[in-house]
């Protein structure tokens, strides 16, 4: 429905989409994205574990599905935006430089928190951390909104034939 290309490892062994579904119950797991590989911590499916992390990270909410949406956003940045000079310039204009020092931004975010007034321009406090995270958080929130509309349509709370016609992006 979104007309986004899904390129797997079978088609692109280096950057195709793949998943590592691991559990921090057995080993340390970091949710993240690298070169098309999305790693998710299945232990976050446990309510108590996830809630402990949510409180520790000072997040208003935290879900495994939210992490999935967020990391898929990183994948689509590299698949669609990072490979197109025009899209990359538009990204820079809207979100900032995706090549800004990530570790520096991460350290600043966890030591200082989100800047005052962040709610005026960002979908989450984490989005303030770095342009790449702003994109991924925005993408995740968009998918969340779309899922909500699809659910509403399935229960006749919205027009079932509503479409969001757009030009297909990507190669």
Stretches found by the model and what they are:
Residues 1-47:
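Auxiliary, metal-adjacent structural segments of Zn-dependent hydrolase domains
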Residues 3, 76-85, 140-148:
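Hydrophobic/aromatic-lined pockets within catalytic cores
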Residues 40-51, 104-118:
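Active-site-adjacent bridging/hinge elements
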Residues 48-68:
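Short pre-active-site segment immediately N-terminal to the catalytic Zn-binding motif
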Residues 56-59, 118-124:
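Flexible glycine/proline-enriched surface loops and loop-helix/loop-strand junctions
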Residues 62-82, 136:
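Active-site recognition of the HExxH zinc-binding catalytic motif
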Residues 66, 79-112:
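Post-HEXXH active-site segment of zinc metalloproteases
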Residues 127-171:
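Pan-zinc metallopeptidase signature
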